[in-house]
């Protein structure tokens, strides 16, 4: 158990923590700072804070996980999805903050890249994996949902939705990191209890995020950027699928879902009503800020909610 759990957490934490003092000054020299939205006056002081810190997270996960690939082959597709979406995020960040192309990847380019990575994962799951695409139904007493070929469109929706959910969640210091630590811990506990064969990478993600949080907690000295947030989305959804638990994302990843829905609702309502808004700002974490909540309070509440939801999900196994 030490080999499977403790070592990945410690090693990935150490790598992430040690990379901080090296990577952050390097990013500052490259002037890869983030530009904050003018509507949030409290965020204007963050202008220029280095982004692309997700490289620290990715490096920690990759370095730790490669030592477990031989004994735990099921971590390979999860590592592929994590790195694959991390690369998409890196390209987006690079275009925005290094090449100063404000839009980064165009919407269709980003979606195409996400579909390509998802397709590789879908082909693996459908043709090469011994993990079926049936889904454990929460609170069903161990019953599984078999959609047949319908599982593939659901997989695409789950991947795209989760990845964009983690992306929208990354809007406050430590928010995406803290929420995903809870989610990764949940998957780690389940993986260990069910001998799912993926515990080393789920534990590595916990350690990597704890190490990154040393520099990302308020006031953050680095942001993960799309490099980190998209990678985390890829991790969450692929880990869930490798344990036949994508339906549990709706529970443990409810914050991701709410963040996405708040944006969809806001944009749709804005267009339908000619400029009216339901929320003061979307994603919804900014709405709470404009309601007077401090940034740290929003992060704490969202993290506590996620922790409670993880306990609820565990009861539903």
What are the residue ranges of the model-derived segments?
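Alpha-helical transmembrane segments
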Residues: 1-24, 57-87, 121-128, 148-317
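Short, Lys/Arg-enriched, Gly/Pro-containing loop segments at transmembrane-helix junctions
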Residues: 29-33, 133-136, 273-280
